[in-house]
UniProtKB/Swiss-Prot annotation:
Organism lineage: Eukaryota, Metazoa, Chordata, Craniata, Vertebrata
Biased composition (Pro residues): 275-286
Keyword annotations: DNA-binding, Isopeptide bond, Metal-binding, Nucleus, Phosphoprotein, Repeat, Transcription, Transcription regulation, Ubl conjugation, Zinc, Zinc-finger
Record-listed Phosphoserine modification sites: S137, S218
Zn finger region (C2H2-type): 332-359, 395-422, 423-450
Protein known as: Zinc finger protein 446
Source superkingdom: Eukaryota
Cited function: May be involved in transcriptional regulation.
One family name in Pfam for this protein: KRAB
MF terms (GO), sorted A to Z: DNA-binding transcription factor activity, RNA polymerase II-specific; identical protein binding; RNA polymerase II cis-regulatory region sequence-specific DNA binding; zinc ion binding
Source species: Homo sapiens (Human)
Family as reported in the entry's similarity comment: Belongs to the krueppel C2H2-type zinc-finger protein family.
Length: 450
């Protein structure tokens, strides 16, 4: 039965709801769905309740609530990556949010570093950090139960954890560490649990960090420009990045292939390196008997009577997870080493490792067109102009000769030569580079309205 018509009434708020964080209340208000309630009047009442939890009219004045609404609308007009970065800084007023955006115009590296660390899931020059475990303490996933101590599901869960922990990890010296077998040591009569090699807590392996340090400044800038252009293309099309996190990690390993790194950063899978690369060979892991020992539930071998046909055995869940998954075909393939790439920008950077001079290019790179068609399911935009990464940078400075990839960088750089600030304050005479800074500055001269 619909509720009777009448003036809207503000719902009574609980004290616990009033004390919750404003950001959580804002997300609940903005993320409200009509399907959560039974009808339109219930939806309207729920929206009023969520709005009161966010704005808190009993604690804020009308001007403060207006500023909160203006700040929310201002952040909603920003591009997605800039909006996420500004929200992370938690601005308290619209002027503070505008000042943060202006700071990005002077120092675009802040936004690029945030995109690299949070969106592309790559840390900027991570430090090699390791956590050491006590020698006598057992690993949490190394506990092995006997067949009669617990149910079968517990033993299977333990085997999955152990199968995930046995993986080759490069140490500080760059040598491969063979997978250890702590369950075998745990079953020793002395009762020693054994220990594993300390796992690295850094995002990239130490070897990748060393190779990154060997790159010169131009190679690092070229890599950042390629990653920024790739991310900007995805954002401009309004599509989420379709590559998984492990694939984004592998592209940095492909970039460093020319300096000696043949192993990809793809977690759990090995890169497809050239035939002559010894690191691209699959590791020699333990056999089926060793994996049966790791599962903690040793099944006795069935007795076969003479004259009876062998019974086919079903693969265990642990063996099924060990089978390598089929890798999809990549649209850009290097003709010299056979390596495949999902992004043309990374393919262009990799191709430069094979060329002996700047004039050697593979077919299709000079014109900006790929030699192969895009995979099925992707949309090609032939009418969109694309900047070629093989040629020189297209925005040079007439004063010092420095070249820049983006025109905005050249505009900011030119102001360092002129030394002139075009926007002056008529009250105090201060000069500013941007008009928006002058507008914010002028508000400080106005008398505050009581």
């Amino acid at each position: 039965m619909p509720s009777p018509l009448g003036p809207p009434c503000l719902p009574v708020m609980d004290p616990e709801t009033t004390l919750e964080e404003p950001e959580t209340a804002r997300l609940r208000f903005r993320g409200f769905c009509y399907q959560e309630v039974a009808g339109p009047r219930e939806a309207l009442a729920r929206l009023r309740e969520l709005c009161c939890q966010w704005l808190q009219p009993e604690a804020h004045s009308k001007e403060q609530m207006l500023e909160m609404l203006v700040l929310e609308q201002f952040l909603g007009t920003l591009p997605p990556e800039i909006q996420a970065w500004v929200r992370g800084q938690r601005p308290g007023s619209p002027e503070e949010a505008a000042a943060l955006v202006e700071g990005l115009q002077h120092d675009p590296g802040q936004l690029l570093g945030w995109i690299t660390a949070h969106v592309l899931k790559q840390e900027v020059l991570p430090a090699a950090q390791k956590t050491e475990e006590p020698l006598g303490s057992p690993h949490p996933s190394g506990t092995v139960e006997s067949p009669g101590e617990g149910p079968q599901d517990t033993r299977i869960e333990g085997s999955v954890q152990l199968s995930c922990s046995v993986k080759e990890e490069p140490n500080v010296d760059g040598q491969e560490v063979a997978p250890s077998s702590p369950p075998l040591a745990a079953q020793s009569p002395e009762g020693n649990h054994g220990h594993q090699e300390p796992a690295s807590t850094s995002f990239h392996p130490p070897r990748i960090q060393e190779e990154w340090g060997l790159l010169d400044r131009s190679q690092k800038e070229l890599y950042w420009d390629a990653m920024l252009e790739k991310y900007g293309t995805v954002v401009s099309l309004g599509l989420p990045p379709h590559q998984p996190e492990a694939q984004a990690q592998s592209e940095l390993g492909m970039l460093l292939t020319g300096t000696g790194v043949c192993r990809s950063l793809r977690s759990g899978n090995e890169s497809e390196g050239p035939p002559g690369c010894p690191e691209a060979q699959p590791p020699q892991g333990p056999g089926p008997a060793a994996w049966e020992g790791l599962s903690g539930a040793a099944t006795p071998a069935p007795t076969v009577r003479p004259g009876t046909p062998p019974v086919p055995t079903q693969p265990t869940p642990a063996e099924t997870r060990l089978e390598p998954a089929a890798t999809p075909r990549k649209p850009y393939t290097c003709e010299q080493c056979g390596r495949g790439f999902d992004w043309k920008s990374v393919f262009v950077i990799h191709h430069r490792t094979h060329t002996s001079g700047p004039g050697v290019q593979s077919p299709g790179l000079a014109t900006g067109e790929s030699t192969e068609k895009p995979p099925q399911g992707e949309v090609a935009f032939p009418h969109h102009p694309r900047r070629s990464l093989t040629g020189p940078r297209s925005y040079p400075c007439e004063e010092c000769g420095c070249s820049f990839s983006w025109k905005s960088q050249l505009v900011i750089h030119r102001k360092s030569h002129t030394g002139q600030r075009r926007h002056f304050c008529s009250d105090c005479g201060r000069a500013f580079d941007w008009k928006s800074q002058l507008v914010i500055h002028r508000k400080g001269h106005r008398p505050e309205v009581p």
